Design a protein with these regions (language model features):
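N-proximal helix/coil linker or "cap" segments that precede and/or mark the start of modular domains
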Residues: 192-220
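Amphipathic alpha-helical coiled-coil segments
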Residues: 155-172, 192-196
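Amphipathic alpha-helical repeat scaffolds of TPR domains
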Residues: 130, 174-184
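Bacterial Sec-dependent N-terminal signal peptides
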Residues: 1-29
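Short, structured interface segments
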Residues: 97-99, 104, 167, 208-219
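A non-transmembrane, solvent-exposed segment enriched in polar/low-complexity residues
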Residues: 18-163
Length: 220
């Protein structure tokens, strides 16, 4: 009898430990899709799209659940009436919130909050510069000197934007956000700046395909 009680207790503890193991839950809302429409979870790996999971929309919402060993850049994708939406984020254990529409928003975990903040800042800066450029080019009342001054102001803002990019990468070079952003923006930095960032990459990311390619490029 005592042995049976012991075995039941051990089994209960094992079940609890299993249930408490790290997992992710992606809770999303989506605009423009009907009940039963399919949304895909995919990873872009070695030049190919790899389907990880799929789910259907119900009441404008969808959910993905599972477990993830390391934070990985993935995509939530759907197509409807010839329109395609693709939102990238970090699939990692934790509660991830997703809002898909004209402007995709993803957060809820440390990497995704940081990544979304970076995107918001970069998009806002880019929009401001584009608006300034279009306005200067379309305003027939401006003199050449005035247009030149606008272009100089845009160059200053561009420099500020790239400083923001560099600082974000540097601050996150030990996590998935920095590792994702560095290869994407490295070409915008001087070689010595690229090297300074690469030297700070932890060993756990040393074999990342994009990082390996970047290192080879820097060395040549």
């Amino acid at each position: 009898m005592k042995k049976l009680v012991y075995l039941l207790a051990v089994g209960s503890l094992a079940f609890t430990a299993c249930n408490n193991s790290p997992a992710y839950k992606v809770s999303g809302t989506v605009e423009g899709l009907a009940d039963g429409d399919t949304i895909y979870l995919q990873e872009y790996k070695n030049g190919d799209w790899v389907k990880l999971d799929s789910t259907t929309v119900a009441g404008g919402t969808f959910t993905f659940t599972g477990r993830q060993d390391t934070a990985t850049n993935c995509f939530i994708i759907y197509a409807k009436d010839g329109k395609r939406n693709r939102a990238d984020f970090f699939l990692e254990n934790g509660n991830i919130t997703v809002a898909l529409g004209e402007e995709n928003k993803i957060g809820g975990t440390a990497n995704n909050d940081t990544y979304q903040q970076f995107k918001d800042n970069f998009i806002a800066m880019s929009k401001e510069m584009n608006d300034m450029y279009r306005s200067a080019m379309s305003d027939s009342t401006l003199t050449d000197e005035q247009r030149e001054n606008v272009m100089k102001e845009i160059e200053k803002k561009d420099s500020i934007a790239m400083d923001m990019v560099f600082n974000t990468i540097e601050a996150n070079i030990t996590n998935a956000v920095g590792i994702q952003l560095l290869p994407s923006y490295a070409a915008a930095f001087e070689l010595d700046k690229q090297k300074s960032l690469v030297e700070k990459i932890p060993a756990q990311f040393a074999n990342n395909d994009r990082i390996v390619k970047l290192k080879k490029h820097i060395e040549t």
